[in-house]
Amino acid sequence: MRCLPVLIILLLLTASAPGVVVLPKTEDDVPMSSVYGNGKSILRGILRNGVCCGYKLCHPC
């Protein structure tokens, strides 16, 4: 009978524990969506400002 409370406590603890091992994020863990969004905003800025071909001739897109 002494084992029953211990067994119940262990069952409650294992049920509330996360099923996946959670690792802390490092600086190398960059989500792909932010990389894609940064590239998109850079391209949008280039296209909005116009493209210069190296000479004095610049044309907007």
Swiss-Prot record:
Disulfide bonds: C52-C61, C53-C58
Propeptide: 20-48
List of residues that carry 4-hydroxyproline: P60
Broad class of the protein's primary localization: secreted
GO MF annotation, one: toxin activity
Location in the cell: Secreted
Record-level GO cellular component terms: extracellular region
Keyword Signal annotated: yes
Keyword Acetylation found: no
Signal peptide: 1-19
InterPro entries attached to this UniProt entry: T-conotoxin
Tissue and organ expression note: Expressed by the venom duct.
Domain of life: Eukaryota
Keywords carried by this UniProt record: Disulfide bond, Hydroxylation, Neurotoxin, Secreted, Signal, Toxin
Additional note from the record: Exists in two forms, due to cis-trans isomerization at 59-His-Hyp-60.
Protein function: Chi-conotoxins inhibit the neuronal noradrenaline transporter (NET/SLC6A2). Activity has been described on both human (inhibition of norepinephrine uptake is IC(50)=1.26 uM) and rat (pIC(50)=6.21 corresponding IC(50)=0.16 uM) transporters. Acts as a reversible non-competitive inhibitor.
Domain notes per entry: The cysteine framework is X (CC-CX[hydroxyPro]C).
Stated family: Belongs to the conotoxin T superfamily.
Protein name as annotated: Chi-conotoxin MrIA
UniProt organism field: Conus marmoreus (Marble cone)
